[in-house]
């Protein structure tokens, strides 16, 4: 049987996806390499909704260690923020960075990042887009972080089985990684309650031997920012897990 006309297109798209995954992993290593100094502002996005421009190579030459000794002394903690597209990952990062929300849903084509200083360490949060072509690469980043935040749209009953499947893959990848599951959009009509989400995500029986937390949140584009109670609780829990 002769090959279908779509065959070459599928192969080309597959190759492009593989290249994208490799680039994402290289950027991750360059951006979040432990002990390496960066020169981007807090909350700057690389490939996300805020900007489509990558920093030029001559903009991130290594800093002189004597110029910023205090920054060099701070340890780094890495948090990976994942979830299906539309679950609220980008809005969550914008709130933590103190940026105003963006109206409507703007999908992340690549990743966004935020660096937040604390008294004893700096927290780097990396969001990878939740579209189907990017989910394949999620597992490559799990072993590089200290905590996983998994965002779930509490109103998206149709795709909840997909979210459960992706979450299970990540949990299997690193059995010891602390996981914070954020049940987002709890303020909307039709949102599943916490008991329903525990059942649908398989949390009641599967993960008794590891640190898995399920928190309710209402991280909406029109929300009140970092002062939103759900966001504050998530941040406090992250600090406890990272300390």
UniProtKB/Swiss-Prot annotation:
**Superkingdom as given in the UniProt entry:** Eukaryota
Q: What keywords would UniProt list here?
A: GTP-binding, Nucleotide-binding
Q: Which Pfam families match?
A: Arf (PF00025)
The answer to whether keyword Metal-binding applies is: no
Q: Where does GTP bind?
A: 83-90, 127-131, 184-187
Q: Which GO terms describe its molecular function?
A: GTP binding; GTPase activity
Show the InterPro entries listed in the entry.
ARL10 (IPR042951), P-loop_NTPase (IPR027417), Small_GTPase_ARF/SAR (IPR006689)
Tell me its family. Answer: Belongs to the small GTPase superfamily. Arf family.
Which PANTHER family would you find in this protein's record?
Answer: ADP-RIBOSYLATION FACTOR-LIKE PROTEIN 10
Q: What is this protein called?
A: ADP-ribosylation factor-like protein 10
What is this organism's lineage? Eukaryota, Metazoa, Chordata, Craniata, Vertebrata
């Amino acid at each position: 049987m002769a090959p279908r006309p779509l065959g070459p297109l599928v192969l080309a798209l597959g190759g492009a996806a593989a290249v994208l995954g490799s680039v994402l992993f290289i950027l991750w290593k360059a951006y979040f390499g432990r002990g390496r100094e960066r020169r981007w502002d807090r909350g700057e996005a690389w490939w996300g909704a805020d900007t489509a421009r990558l920093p030029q190579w001559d903009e991130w030459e290594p800093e002189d260690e004597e110029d910023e000794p205090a920054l060099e002394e701070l340890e780094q903690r890495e948090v990976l923020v994942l979830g299906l597209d539309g679950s609220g990952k980008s809005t969550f990062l914008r709130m933590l960075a103190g940026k105003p929300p963006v109206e409507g849903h703007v999908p992340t084509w690549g990743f966004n990042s935020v660096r937040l200083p604390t008294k004893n360490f700096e927290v780097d949060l990396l969001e990878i887009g939740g579209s189907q072509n990017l989910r394949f690469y999620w597992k490559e980043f799990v072993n590089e972080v200290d905590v996983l935040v998994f965002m779930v749209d509490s109103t998206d009953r149709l795709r909840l089985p997909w979210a459960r499947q992706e979450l299970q893959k990540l949990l299997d990848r690193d059995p010891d990684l602390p996981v914070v599951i954020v049940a987002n959009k709890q303020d909307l009509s039709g949102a599943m309650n916490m008991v329903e989400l525990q059942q649908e995500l398989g949390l009641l029986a599967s993960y008794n031997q590891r640190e898995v937390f399920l928190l309710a949140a209402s991280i909406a584009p029109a929300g009140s920012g970092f002062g939103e109670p759900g966001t504050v609780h998530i941040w406090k829990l992250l600090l406890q897990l990272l300390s």
